[in-house]
């Protein structure tokens, strides 16, 4: 039986031009082109950091995993929102005769927004898949963060006052209502690293970053808001973007530009440990994650035809809408539910699945 590992990541623009960024942004928005001013802002941010190394780094990570596991598995790489796209790579895997595939998402934590967003592309009548849900507890990865933070404390902070700020990509606040495990996993991850360092609860905190402006509330505190709200600052802030493993715009701009600029304004020393990137400890974590999970059950993924636009029976919409305030449901979902003149309304697939998990919508 031919087996494979499919390593997947979010993706990035194929070229740093206005239209290159526009194409990537449009893919993220599911084919709806953002307004020009939104594209311009993102384009300017990419220009400010000199482009993004994400694809280069990810391909190097893939090559290093392949060097360790290539005798047993064919190793493939795909992006969610840029080339090579997941469906295209699955097509190539089918042509190569692959029958079983371990899916390793290069995001250590499980979230409905991340893992479920990848699963929807896993459609094949030939290949059975095993999706690894999370791997943030891998000892090698925990040691990486603890070791790199310890270096900063020893070599740069020394006896000065400091605070370690663990930050993670934010998610919409209604994730709390749906029981998304991501938030608790971030807190646990931070605590595990802090314990390795012997930090007291006063020496570290958790914040969120990189939220999108799509008209819905996100988990707080945002890292920039946290910094602005402090009445006193330590001598040093150590920023640890723990939900990421590679350098990309949400680290190089959101941390190294925006957080750095605020530290300069407040007269505080800015530090950020290097991202794991291609470090051997990260590769150890990825390889061990495969080893720990490789004997689990593989299964077919045959999503319904209408992945992002599932049909919701109209007689259920009133109850959903009545509870939408408590759920802090996004306006765009309310508008979908409120549509008149049809027997069914369409609801984004992800929202439907989250409603099911929250017990707000009967499972089919």
Swiss-Prot record:
GO biological process: heme biosynthetic process
Keyword tags: Cytoplasm, Heme biosynthesis, Iron, Lyase, Metal-binding, Porphyrin biosynthesis
Residues involved in Fe-coproporphyrin III binding: 29, 118
Annotated residues for binding of Fe(2+): 169, 250
The enzyme's E.C. designation: 4.99.1.9
Functional summary from the UniProt entry: Involved in coproporphyrin-dependent heme b biosynthesis. Catalyzes the insertion of ferrous iron into coproporphyrin III to form Fe-coproporphyrin III.
Protein name, UniProt field: Coproporphyrin III ferrochelatase
Gene: cpfC
């Amino acid at each position: 039986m031919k087996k494979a590992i499919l390593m997947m990541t979010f993706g990035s623009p194929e070229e740093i031009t206005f239209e290159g960024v526009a194409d990537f942004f449009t893919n993220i928005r599911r084919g709806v082109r953002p307004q020009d001013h939104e594209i311009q802002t993102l384009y300017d941010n990419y220009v400010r950091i000199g482009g993004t190394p994400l694809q280069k780094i990810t391909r190097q990570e893939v090559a290093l995993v392949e060097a360790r596991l290539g005798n047993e598995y064919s190793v493939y790489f795909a992006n969610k929102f840029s080339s090579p796209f997941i469906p295209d790579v699955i097509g190539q895997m089918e042509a190569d005769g692959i029958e079983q595939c371990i899916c390793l998402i290069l995001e250590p934590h499980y979230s409905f927004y991340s893992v479920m967003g990848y699963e929807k592309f896993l459609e094949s009548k030939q290949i059975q898949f095993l999706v690894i849900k999370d791997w943030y507890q891998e000892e090698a990865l925990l040691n990486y963060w603890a070791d790199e933070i310890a270096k900063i404390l020893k070599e740069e902070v020394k006896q000065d006052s400091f605070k370690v700020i663990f930050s993670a990509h934010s998610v919409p606040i209604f994730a709390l209502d749906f029981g998304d495990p991501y938030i608790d996993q971030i807190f646990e991850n931070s605590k595990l690293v802090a314990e390795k360092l012997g930090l007291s609860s006063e020496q570290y905190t958790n914040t969120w970053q990189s939220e999108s402006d799509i008209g819905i509330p996100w988990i707080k505190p945002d890292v920039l808001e946290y910094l602005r709200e402090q009445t006193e600052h330590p001598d040093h802030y150590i920023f640890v973007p723990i939900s990421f493993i590679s350098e990309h715009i949400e680290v190089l701009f959101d941390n190294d530009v925006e957080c750095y600029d605020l530290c300069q304004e407040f007269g505080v020393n800015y530090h950020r440990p290097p991202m794991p990137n291609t470090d051997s400890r990260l590769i150890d974590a990825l390889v061990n994650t495969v080893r720990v999970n490789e004997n689990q059950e593989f299964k077919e993924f045959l999503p319904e035809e209408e992945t992002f636009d599932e049909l919701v029976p109209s007689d259920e919409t009133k109850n959903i809408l009545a509870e939408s305030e408590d759920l802090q449901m996004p306006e765009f979902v309310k508008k979908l539910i409120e549509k008149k003149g049809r027997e069914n309304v369409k609801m984004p697939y992800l929202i439907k699945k989250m409603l099911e998990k929250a017990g707000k919508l009967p499972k089919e």
